[in-house]
Amino acid sequence: MIALTKPTLAPRSPPHGCVDRPKANDCDSCGARALSVCSSVADIDLVRLGDLAEVVKLSAGAVLTREGEPAPHVFNITSGSLRVYKLLPDGRRQITGFLFAGDFLGLAIGESYVFSAEAIETTTVCRFRKGPFRALVESSSPLEHMLLHRTSHELAAAQNQMLLLGRKTAIERLASFLLDLPGHDPARPTAPGHVRLPMKRGEIADYLGLTIETVSRVLTRMKAKGIISMPSQSDLIVERPDLLRAHASGEV
């Protein structure tokens, strides 16, 4: 689904129609297929799904959806990563999640988007109009079951996030985040213990309900204890997973 691409979108404009649609054989070669809802689709339905898909390429910082605007589409991420967030009336931002290849966006929305989504890095998504996509889902039991599973997973993740924000200390929050993140980025396999951090420190802070200074201070403390090392700003190595797990569970 990612062989054809669109021109990069302007950061303040939501994406509109693509000139071309991908062919079904692009779905067969899509690197994110095994990670996404597409993995449940039979060959005949995969052809139909490919016919519905529009491929959109986003540059870093480009807007995919904006909170409060009409929501005619759902999206399947095939490469890159997104930050999903809501804005408070005073302008403060709460990031509610980071999405990676294989994630599906827009399952539980109504007529308007209840969140904004922006690309953290160069990102490609397959975009589907909700009406035709729902019709396909209703005719494909495996796809329907997969989407139900994804929705249940999102609810469980939301409950875990409430616990993280409501009860955990700063070091417990960051340790939990570092343990959880690699499992959400399966399209980017790394060596054991390596964690890819495409997001900025401020974005991590907005996700964990902390300040940038607190995130930096906790990371420095973890490095001093030998729990982690950081070859670069976007690459972290967990040197002591046992201690990281202990901090995440509040045992230290």
Region spans (language model):
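Cyclic nucleotide-binding regulatory module and flanking cytosolic helices
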Residues: 2-59, 103-105, 110
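Cyclic nucleotide-binding regulatory domains
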Residues: 37, 46, 62-122
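Short aromatic/basic micro-patch
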Residues: 55, 74, 98, 127, ...
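A secondary-structure boundary/capping signal
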Residues: 60, 100-101, 129, 151, ...
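Cyclic-nucleotide recognition modules
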Residues: 95-156, 160
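Polybasic "coupling" helices that flank or enter modular domains
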Residues: 138-211
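Phosphate-/nucleic-acid-contacting segments
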Residues: 183-252
